[in-house]
Curated annotation (Swiss-Prot):
The lineage of its organism: Eukaryota, Metazoa, Chordata, Craniata, Vertebrata. GO terms for biological process: phospholipid transport. This is PRELI domain-containing protein 2. PANTHER family: MSF1/PX19 RELATED (PTHR11158). GO terms for molecular function: phosphatidic acid transfer activity. One of its GO terms (cellular component) is mitochondrial intermembrane space. InterPro entries: PRELI/MSF1_dom, Slowmo/Ups. Residues 1-187 form the PRELI/MSF1 domain. Disulfide bonds: none annotated.
């Protein structure tokens, strides 16, 4: 089955400022769930100018304790007990392609933890707004699907959907705050 969350936001700041703020967004005291972000790889294609980055984020496990306990007692294959969600942190991998010439950045993220039971993927784009070239449009689609935990698949997907929506809104608020702090008031129409 799976659940999807779509986000669309226009930042009234130039593309370069928005991307710079995005790349410095975490860790941040406004979102204590993101513990650290580390650049694993960064390279520039000299012919196109595209900058590729791979980052790993370490985040707190936000699955409620009641769901962790329920799932930790599941018996899977050979009657072996597994602790599916009893981990303190999760890892996310983010890849981005920044094209300064065309003023766009594509981002793909996925979860490296729980891959046997869950698939979490996000695709995002920052691009110059068609409405105003001094503004930046942000479009994101996130998808989570849970398998292998029976009737709890739906419960976990519902929780994940709510968490994704709230996280997206929190991310937008953090970006707006950072942009205002670093760049001043938004640009007028």
């Amino acid at each position: 089955m799976g659940v999807s969350v779509d986000v669309h936001q226009v930042y009234k700041y130039p593309f370069e400022q928005v991307v710079a703020s995005f790349l410095r967004k975490y860790p941040n005291p406004m979102d204590k769930n993101v513990i650290s972000v580390k650049i694993m790889e960064e390279k520039r294609d000299e012919s196109t100018g595209v900058i590729y980055r791979k980052r790993i984020a370490i985040c707190q496990n936000v699955v409620p304790e009641i769901l962790r306990k329920s799932l930790s007692t599941l018996v899977i294959l050979c009657w072996k007990k597994v602790s599916i969600l009893k981990v303190p942190n999760i890892q996310l991998e983010e890849e981005s392609w920044l094209n300064p010439r065309e003023r766009n950045m594509a981002i793909r993220s996925h979860c490296l933890t729980w891959t046997q039971y869950a698939s979490m993927k996000e695709e995002s784009v920052f691009r110059e707004s068609m409405e105003n070239p001094n503004w930046t449009e942000f479009i994101q689609r996130g998808r989570i699907s849970i398998t292998g935990v029976g009737f709890l698949n739906c419960v976990l997907e519902t929780f994940a959907s709510t968490f994704l929506r709230q996280g997206a809104q929190k991310g937008i608020r953090i970006m707006e705050m950072l942009l205002k702090e670093q760049c001043g008031a938004p640009l007028a129409e």
